[in-house]
């Protein structure tokens, strides 16, 4: 016998058909909350890092790849970190060390990818002790462990509390609008970066050709 009762979210509220795509779950959490948390972590991470670097440089420093206040590294890191580490909520020692290791590995992979595809790195640990290629260092690894505890124990629950205060339809529109703006922003920046790279390689090739011609 078919179950015709309406689907409900984690708060027991009915979900209309057009909103059901947002209720599909990944590792026990619906897509709506995952994307909303991703956006909030990305904005919060950008704000914290830009504030810190602006203080260090004594001038405003945008730590995002695009023009807007968005840093997806923190979005992915925060969401994935919580999904993986939340089972260790009551085991602080294991939570700290696993969080430190996973975050350091994630930071290294992101750094290598940026150097490979963008030709630049958004951070530089070369002046830090016990660093590796300027991408990771002991100081950041120690800090990542405490960040992991903070996210799992406090930040994520508070974030979900804020998300739940926003009406679902309004929240989905906000998420879609923000991600669309970010996609446009990042597309423009990628075009600019790769255009500069292509032009620089073209100029280098032109100089080599001119040098060969001059020899003849």
What residue spans do the PLM features occupy?
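Aromatic-rich, lipid-facing transmembrane alpha helices and their immediate juxtamembrane interface loops
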Residues: 16-216
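Positively charged N-terminal leader segments that act as targeting/secretion signals
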Residues: 1-18
